[in-house]
């Protein structure tokens, strides 16, 4: 991914598109995240949390309708749409391909951005994609039992933690995998609230 140039927007202002548009995160010159230079792509934590809130609302409505009315059409459709949305984020981040990510970015467009590392967010989106895809496959195959509901409730819990509390559980897991030397990214994760702070990997020193 190319590094930022003087033509890139200021990190002090929110913007709808990353540069280049098909990158998961944005690169900036002279940006620091939690006291260290951000030599890695970043995303706007506020937009991520807003998007998580939208997904949480959709998932909650779908599961409630399935549970109380025994109508599984909404959960079948929403699970497919959410899985597709998270898949698109793996390609181009929150914008412009992800409809929910774009909506989340739009909702916080007038707020000062809070930049965090994109790598661990991509890991979190991959986990959410896997869960949504599993729900989509099972519900569209006619499986609507307790197991599917538990997967859905777990996903809602993770989204609630992200959007309401501001704690990304998957990002924390990602940082623990680094600490256990199970994965070796070039940069240590920079999470919201500095909640997954660890020493920079040897490759980045």
Over which residues does each language-model region extend?
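Membrane-interfacial helix-loop segments of redox and metal-homeostasis proteins
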Residues: 2-3, 8-205
């Amino acid at each position: 991914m190319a590094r930022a140039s003087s033509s890139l927007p200021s990190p002090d202002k929110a913007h709808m598109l990353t540069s280049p548009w098909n990158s998961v995160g944005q690169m900036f010159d002279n940006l620091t995240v939690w006291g260290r230079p951000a030599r890695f792509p970043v995303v706007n934590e506020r937009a991520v949390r807003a998007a998580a809130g939208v997904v949480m609302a959709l998932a909650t409505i779908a599961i409630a309708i399935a549970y109380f009315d025994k109508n599984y059409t909404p959960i079948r459709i929403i699970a497919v749409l959410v899985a597709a949305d998270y898949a698109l984020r793996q390609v181009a981040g929150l914008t412009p391909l992800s409809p929910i990510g774009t909506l989340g970015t739009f909702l916080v467009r007038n707020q000062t951005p809070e930049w965090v590392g994109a790598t661990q967010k991509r890991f979190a989106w991959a986990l959410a994609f896997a869960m949504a895809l599993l729900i989509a496959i099972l519900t569209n195959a006619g499986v609507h039992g307790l197991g599917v509901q538990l997967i859905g409730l777990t996903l809602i819990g993770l989204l609630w933690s992200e959007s309401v509390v501001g704690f990304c559980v998957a990002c924390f897991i990602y940082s623990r995998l680094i600490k256990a030397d199970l994965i070796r990214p070039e940069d240590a994760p920079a999470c919201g609230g500095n909640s997954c702070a660890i020493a920079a990997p040897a490759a980045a020193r």
